[in-house]
């Protein structure tokens, strides 16, 4: 197979591993800088050009689209789909997952466990918003944030009001969530490929920190997930329409709660922690499922 990897940086661990795994299994792997691909949206003959030449003959495409280039990246991926190239994750599902609020709305409609979450526009509604998520302590999240950036833990209602007012004053969209104290600064990353959770790890925040992201100095360890956690991760990925996803789950007193569904989960943390060939499993999924004109929109957006 000829497989494209949409990635800004061929030296990133995840990109390198996917290329290695593909070559090991006998495929031709081509890394394409997402922002250097440009499109000819012609009737009956959609094309993508790259460094002066049309891209042709691809069987599958693996999108590794960073949050900052979501709009353009999804447009390039959509053009691949129009050309009949099989996407590991579809453009519509990636766009859906990048909108944190929409993601939670879709998951809640399907009855998947979530932390109580509030969203408001007017400063007049802040006191009621805080009550809605069971008061302080609570967590405030910027909707566009990634890797734990733009996430604030407010210990008191007064602090929460000040922070929410500040964000609103900056015209920054935020959501407010209940703080799950019993999780103890830890979450579980379940790595979903197809209809299986192929690997999972526990991420623990460093002392004095509540964000467990590895980019924020959190540590990762092996964990055995429960059948309920496994089912929650699979259902969350399915609702989002993602074939490959990193589903972040908190262990609460009332069962597993989904924090986020990541459409471009990093491979380094999960491979190093579990010693599993996750990249190889992703390529294997493409071998089994890809075919010309197999793009079908999944999920219920």
Swiss-Prot record:
PROSITE patterns: ATP_GRASP. Mn(2+) 2 binds at residues 260, 262. GO terms for molecular function: ATP binding; metal ion binding; ribosomal S6-glutamic acid ligase activity. Its cofactor is Mg(2+); Mn(2+). One of its GO terms (biological process) is protein modification process. Pfam families: RimK, Rimk_N. Its EC number is 6.3.2.-. Binds 2 magnesium or manganese ions per subunit. GO terms for cellular component: cytoplasm. The keyword Magnesium applies. The keyword Magnesium applies. Coiled coil: none annotated. It is an enzyme of class 6 (ligase). Keywords: ATP-binding, Ligase, Magnesium, Manganese, Metal-binding, Nucleotide-binding, Protein biosynthesis. Mg(2+) 2 binds at residues 260, 262. Mn(2+) 1 binds at residues 248, 260. Mg(2+) 1 binds at residues 248, 260. InterPro entries: ATP-grasp, ATP-grasp_RimK-type, ATP_grasp_subdomain_1, RimK, Rimk_N, Rp_bS6_RimK/Lys_biosynth_LsyX. Residues 104-287 form the ATP-grasp domain. It comes from the Bacteria. PANTHER family: RIBOSOMAL PROTEIN BS6--L-GLUTAMATE LIGASE (PTHR21621:SF7), RIBOSOMAL PROTEIN S6 MODIFICATION PROTEIN (PTHR21621). Belongs to the RimK family. This is Probable alpha-L-glutamate ligase. The lineage of its organism: Bacteria, Pseudomonadati, Pseudomonadota, Gammaproteobacteria, Pseudomonadales. The gene is rimK.
